[in-house]
């Protein structure tokens, strides 16, 4: 039995009481009484959660428990925080302080008694409904046990897009042919119901060898139901012209003209994914010339959208899978596993499992998404009884499905089962994804910090960090096909995750059912129903516009998280709304990224939010921070990555619980920050020797990630300070001195024994010897280094390097050589803006695992002769080089690239 969301809250409260037992000394009797009742409550909740769909009264009891647990947490944490602040004031006015202390303790004891009484009443009510105590709790495998099992067998289910395709090979060929060879059409459309595989099919066409060779540039834009014309145009421009920098502030009419002209002059493929209505196309179409080299691949649930965009368009309607194809796909996910070497092996299929599986996939209605989710669920079950339990849960939907609605209900039942089967911590993680707008690329680090701020994930004594644990959670959700993860081999860690819109509907439905979250949009600001629900919700997600002003008094004063998602830089908090901070005293998570504050001042009332664990002001319009920030002593995450110059008072030193701190890039010249007390920091971004002392780093021994700007001649001190950071894995080092001073990079990073990712933007005429670097260094990014000697002979001997980027004058010599046997693990290489480079020799046997190569604006470079030796190469991107005529079919050097599946030319005709 999978544990419920409410049970997780009770478990967290239990842990809080245990963790703070010493500080609650003196009122132990009341605390012990509360813990006893919590123990009884936990045993009842396992049965109550299983019966919540059968009884409204049970659901009401669960909601009561949720509110009681939240109230108890608020009471306990407020008491502990007030006690800490009282002690902090010293011995002045001792008698008065003691009197207040005793009053607070008596009130706290009374409050705890009240909470205990409420829990007793709930327990009595539950028992009257026949809810049973389940003490054993051994009926479900914990996430930790599941992860241990997975680590032992190292299984990876075949859930990539490529392996999910069943019976569509001919369709891919036909669609690719129309895009490349049919000059009478501009638009190729793929239509079909949600979850049927339109995007998966489009992605296969997009990456088809013939398509990649034919077009000069590519853009992929998710449109969805909520979009702005400007945002779609911006995304198209950014993908077709990635080198042209930030265009977020470009006038819409100027952008329209530039994009129109661009599409007139080259062969570009634009994918518009999930266009809902014909009117949506009418809003977007102004940037597309009537007939030029551009083509469009469009996906929609509405078959008429493609015809409306181009009456001559080629339309392809996706079909549902047959029962046989559905089982074949499910089998792939459940029974085909890869070992550590990547070898695919089949697991023997039990006859009873196969019989049940073939019946269960009929509930998926032939939708690949539903089949994949069912497969992900069944892949966690290894015995016939476990499969039987899933079968019984789906059972009522196996018969009598005669209409489309019946089919959809059975499909949503399958998707919902994947949620119900999750361990309680993963339920919270999954529900948290409901905060994000449709098709939003969810930055996983941001997600992990949200979860940590709410106590959903925590670090462990064994050295497991919040990020480590968060990645385990996401891997589990991805294994179940409930999310997709974008993991770029250029980088150490996962960057983004996403949900399919049908899975998101399940997520939103469950979040509403659990009263987990309310989403507030400008378009619904006047909705009475929305206002009523806002008054109950503890979490609030605001999507776009100047919506915070519209919330008014409808927000529940006990809201714990308030997240704002901007679609454009248009949001502004006026002074009249600033009291809203005071009206939300229990906030733990506050994200005001890209918010504009009138007058550039963050209201001092921010200091009243003493429970805050997460505060993001990333790209907010702020010029002055108040000293009241010093009150936020429980902060774990603070992002001050503002736009422009800002005044920062020296109060950050008081936030000693911080795990993540991003400082502003530019502060007033007189700013001096003392940061040595921030001993729990794991990530410190934008640290500058101009505003703080390098010596402060000596105390931050838990740092795993550091970005640092050198503004003075402090390399010796810096080297010794970095040497103390024995846990450092990621280092970004930038030189801002004028004039630039030559460094010996190896001296700086010599003692960083766990370093895996290194970015250097320092003047360094010669690259250090390889023995100065940790052998497990995986990723290196060098720019503006002005290296005069070829760094490749040293870099290629770093045996674990997976990605190398040399850009913007990293190397100023004329010749580079990649020798035989060099770079044995390298997957990605980028050479960009190396203006003096003329010759690059690639010997046979070099870079045997290279998958992607980008050569950008190296104007003097001759076409490398050994590219054809790199047989592993899958993607070659050439930007701003005059090689296209030689490398296209029929060109004199085509043989060098003919076996590379994806060759892309960008701005190569100038």
Swiss-Prot record:
It holds the Pfam family NB-ARC. One of its GO terms (biological process) is response to molecule of fungal origin. LRR repeats lie at residues 584-609, 610-632, 634-655, 700-725, 726-751, 847-871. Residues 22-60 form a coiled coil. InterPro entries: Apaf_helical, Disease_R_plants, LRR_dom_sf, LRR_R13L4/SHOC2-like, NB-ARC, P-loop_NTPase, RX-like_CC, Rx_N. Residues 169-461 form the NB-ARC domain. The lineage of its organism: Eukaryota, Viridiplantae, Streptophyta, Embryophyta, Tracheophyta. The LRR repeats probably act as specificity determinant of pathogen recognition. Changing residue 192 to E: Loss of victorin sensitivity. GO terms for molecular function: ADP binding; ATP binding. Keywords: ATP-binding, Coiled coil, Leucine-rich repeat, Nucleotide-binding, Plant defense, Repeat. Changing residue 511 to T: Loss of victorin sensitivity. Induction: Repressed by silencing mediated by polycomb group (PcG) protein complex containing EMF1 and EMF2. Confers susceptibility to the fungus Cochliobolus victoriae by conditioning victorin-dependent (victorin is a toxin synthesized by C.victoriae) induction of defense-associated proteins. Belongs to the disease resistance NB-LRR family. RPP8/HRT subfamily. This is Disease susceptibility protein LOV1.
């Amino acid at each position: 039995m999978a544990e419920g969301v409410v049970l997780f809250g009770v478990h967290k409260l239990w842990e809080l009481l245990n963790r703070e037992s010493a500080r609650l000394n003196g009122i132990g009797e009341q605390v012990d009484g509360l813990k006893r009742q919590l123990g009884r409550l936990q045993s009842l909740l396992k049965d109550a959660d299983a019966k919540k769909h059968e009884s409204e009264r049970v659901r009401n009891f669960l909601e009561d428990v949720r509110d009681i647990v939240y109230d108890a947490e608020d009471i306990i944490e407020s008491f502990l925080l007030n006690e800490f602040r009282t002690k902090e004031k010293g011995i002045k006015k001792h008698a008065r302080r003691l009197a207040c202390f005793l009053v607070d303790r008596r009130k706290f004891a009374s409050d705890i008694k009240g909470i205990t009484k409420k829990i007793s009443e709930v327990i009595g009510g539950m028992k009257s409904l026949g809810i049973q105590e389940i003490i054993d709790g051994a009926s479900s495998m914990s996430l930790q046990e599941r992860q241990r099992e997975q680590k032992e067998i190292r299984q990876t289910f075949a859930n990539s897009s490529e392996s999910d395709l069943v019976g569509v090979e001919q369709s891919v060929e036909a669609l690719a042919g129309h895009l490349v060879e049919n000059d009478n059409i501009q638009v190729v459309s793929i239509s079909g119901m949600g979850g049927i595989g339109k995007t998966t099919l489009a992605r296969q066409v997009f990456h088809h060898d013939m398509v990649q060779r034919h077009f000069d540039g590519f853009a992929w834009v998710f449109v969805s139901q909520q979009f702005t014309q400007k945002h779609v145009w911006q995304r198209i421009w950014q993908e077709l012209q990635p080198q042209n920098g930030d265009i977020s502030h470009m006038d819409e009419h100027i952008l329209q003209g530039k994009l129109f002209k661009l599409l007139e002059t080259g062969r570009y493929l634009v994918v518009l994914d999930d266009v809902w209505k014909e009117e949506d196309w009418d809003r977007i179409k102004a940037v597309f010339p009537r007939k030029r080299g551009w083509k469009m691949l469009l996906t929609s649930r509405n078959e008429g959208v493609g015809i409306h965009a181009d009456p001559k368009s080629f339309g392809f309607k996706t079909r549902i899978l047959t029962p046989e194809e559905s089982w074949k796909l499910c089998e792939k996910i459940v029974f085909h596993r890869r070992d550590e070497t990547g070898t695919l092996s089949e697991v023997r299929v039990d006859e009873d499992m196969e019989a049940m599986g073939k019946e269960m996939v009929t509930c998926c209605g032939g939708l690949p998404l539903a089949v994949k989710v069912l497969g992900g669920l069944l892949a966690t079950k290894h015995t016939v009884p476990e499969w039987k339990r899933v079968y019984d849960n789906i059972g009522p939907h196996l018969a009598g499905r005669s209409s489309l609605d019946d089919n959809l209900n059975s499909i949503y039942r399958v998707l919902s089962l994947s949620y119900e089967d999750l361990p309680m911590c993963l339920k919270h993680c999954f529900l948290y994804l409901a905060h994000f707008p449709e098709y939003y690329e969810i930055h996983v680090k941001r997600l992990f910090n949200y979860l940590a701020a709410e106590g959903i994930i925590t670090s462990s004594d064994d050295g497991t960090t919040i990020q480590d644990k968060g990645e385990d959670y996401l891997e589990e959700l991805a294994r179940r096909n409930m999310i997709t993860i974008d993991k770029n081999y250029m980088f150490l860690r996962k960057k983004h995750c996403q949900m399919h819109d049908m899975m998101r509907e399940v997520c939103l439905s469950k979040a509403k059912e659990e009263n987990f979250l309310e989403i507030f949009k400008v378009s619904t600001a006047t909705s009475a129903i929305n206002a009523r629900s806002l008054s109950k919700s503890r979490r609030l997600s605001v999507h776009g516009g100047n919506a915070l002003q519209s919330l008014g008094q409808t927000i529940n004063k006990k809201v714990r998280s308030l997240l704002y998602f901007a679609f454009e830089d248009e949001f502004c908090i006026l002074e009249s709304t600033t009291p809203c901070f005071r009206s939300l005293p229990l906030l733990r998570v506050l994200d005001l990224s890209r918010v504009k504050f009138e007058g550039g001042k963050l209201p001092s009332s921010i200091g009243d939010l003493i429970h805050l664990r997460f505060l993001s002001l990333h790209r907010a319009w702020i010029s002055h921070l108040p000293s009241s920030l010093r009150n936020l002593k429980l902060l774990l995450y603070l992002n001050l990555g503002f736009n422009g110059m800002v005044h920062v008072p020296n109060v950050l030193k008081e936030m000693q619980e911080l795990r993540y701190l991003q400082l502003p890039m530019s502060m007033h010249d007189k700013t001096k920050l003392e940061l040595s007390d921030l001993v729990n920091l794991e990530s410190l971004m934008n640290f500058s020797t101009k505003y703080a002392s390098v010596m402060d780093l000596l105390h931050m021994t838990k740092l795993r990630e550091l970005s640092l700007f050198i503004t003075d001649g402090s390399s010796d001190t810096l080297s010794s300070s970095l040497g103390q950071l024995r846990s450092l894995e990621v280092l970004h080092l930038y030189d801002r001195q004028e004039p630039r001073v030559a460094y010996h990079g190896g001296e700086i990073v010599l003692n960083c024994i766990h370093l895996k990712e290194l970015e250097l933007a320092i003047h360094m005429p010669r690259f250090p010897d390889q023995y100065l670097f940790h052998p497990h260094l995986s990723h290196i990014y060098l720019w503006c280094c002005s290296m005069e000697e070829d760094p490749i002979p040293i870099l290629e001997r770093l045996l674990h390097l997976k990605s190398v980027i040399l850009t913007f004058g990293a190397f100023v010599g004329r010749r580079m050589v990649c020798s035989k046997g060099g770079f044995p693990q390298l997957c990605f290489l980028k050479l960009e803006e190396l203006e003096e480079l003329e010759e690059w020799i690639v010997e046979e046997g070099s870079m045997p695992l290279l998958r992607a190569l980008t050569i950008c604006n190296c104007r003097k470079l001759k076409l490398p002769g050994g590219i054809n030796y790199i047989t592993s190469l899958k993607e070659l991107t050439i930007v701003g080089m005059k090689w296209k005529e030689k490398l296209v079919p029929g060109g004199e050097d085509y043989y060098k690239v003919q076996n590379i599946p994806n060759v892309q030319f960008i701005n190569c005709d100038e």
